[in-house]
Regions:
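Hydrophobic transmembrane alpha-helical segments in integral membrane proteins
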Residues: 1-18
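Small-residue-rich transmembrane alpha-helices that serve as helix-helix interface/gating elements
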Residues: 9-12, 130-146
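Juxtamembrane "helix-exit" motif on the non-cytosolic side of transmembrane helices
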Residues: 24-25, 55-64, 116-125
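Membrane-interface helix-boundary motifs at transmembrane edges
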Residues: 26-39, 90-98, 158-159
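Membrane-helix exit/interface motif
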Residues: 52-65, 83-91
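Non-cytosolic membrane-interface motifs at loop->transmembrane helix junctions
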Residues: 64-75, 99-102, 125-135
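Hydrophobic alpha-helical membrane segments
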Residues: 76, 80, 84, 100-120, ...
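Alpha-helical transmembrane segments in multipass membrane proteins, preferentially the mid-helix core
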Residues: 79-94, 148-150
Length: 169
C-alpha cells in the first residue's frame, strides 16, 4: 500500500509540475502561432510514444506484469505514435484538422485507459521495472500536451493577414 501511495504521489506531482510548465512556458509560445506551427512540436513529442512497446520486453518489466495491461498500453502507444506521424504529414492538407482530432482523441483516451487499467488490476509499481518513469513522468506530460492540442483545436481559426497590401495602380 505504501508503494502504491508513493506511485500516486509521484504521478500527482508530475501533473502539477507539467501543468505549471505548460501555463508558464508552453502555452505562451504556442498561443501566438497558427494551428500547424503550434501543434508541430507536440506531434513530434508524441511520435516517440513507440517507446510504450517496452512494456512488452521481458527484463525491462517484471514477468509478473499482467499482459492484459501491457499489451493494450503498448499497442495503444504505438497506434498513437503512428497517428502523430500521420498528423504531421497532413498538417498542410485539407485533412489536417481531422487527423489532429483523431490523433488527440485516440492518444488521450489511450493514456486515460492505461491509468484506468493499471488501477483496475491493482498494478504493483515494482512490476513496471525500468518503465516506471513512463506513467510517473512521461504520461502526465503527454496528457498535458493533449490538453494543449484540444485547446488549439477549439480556438477560432483566423486567416493570415498579409504584411503589406499591393498598391492600387
Amino acid at each position: 500500500m505504501f508503494y502504491t501511495a508513493l506511485f500516486g504521489i509521484t504521478i500527482a506531482f508530475s501533473f502539477v509540475v507539467w501543468g505549471l510548465a505548460a501555463r508558464q512556458y508552453f502555452w505562451p509560445v504556442l498561443r501566438g502561432r497558427g494551428r500547424a506551427d503550434a501543434v508541430r512540436p507536440i506531434l513530434y513529442l508524441h511520435a516517440f510514444r513507440f517507446m510504450g512497446l517496452t512494456f512488452l520486453i521481458p527484463g525491462v518489466v517484471s514477468p509478473d506484469l499482467a499482459s492484459s495491461f501491457a499489451r493494450p498500453v503498448a499497442y495503444g502507444d504505438l497506434a498513437t505514435a503512428i497517428l502523430a506521424l500521420l498528423a504531421l504529414a497532413m498538417l498542410d492538407s485539407k485533412l489536417s484538422a481531422a487527423s489532429l482530432w483523431l490523433f488527440n482523441i485516440v492518444g488521450a483516451v489511450d493514456l486515460l485507459n492505461a491509468y484506468y487499467q493499471g488501477n483496475r488490476i491493482s498494478l504493483v509499481p515494482g512490476q513496471l521495472g525500468a518503465t516506471y518513469v513512463i506513467p510517473t513522468l512521461v504520461v502526465p506530460l503527454l496528457l498535458v500536451t493533449h490538453a494543449l492540442v484540444f485547446r488549439i483545436l477549439l480556438r477560432p481559426q483566423t486567416q493570415a493577414i498579409p504584411r503589406s497590401l499591393p498598391h492600387a495602380a
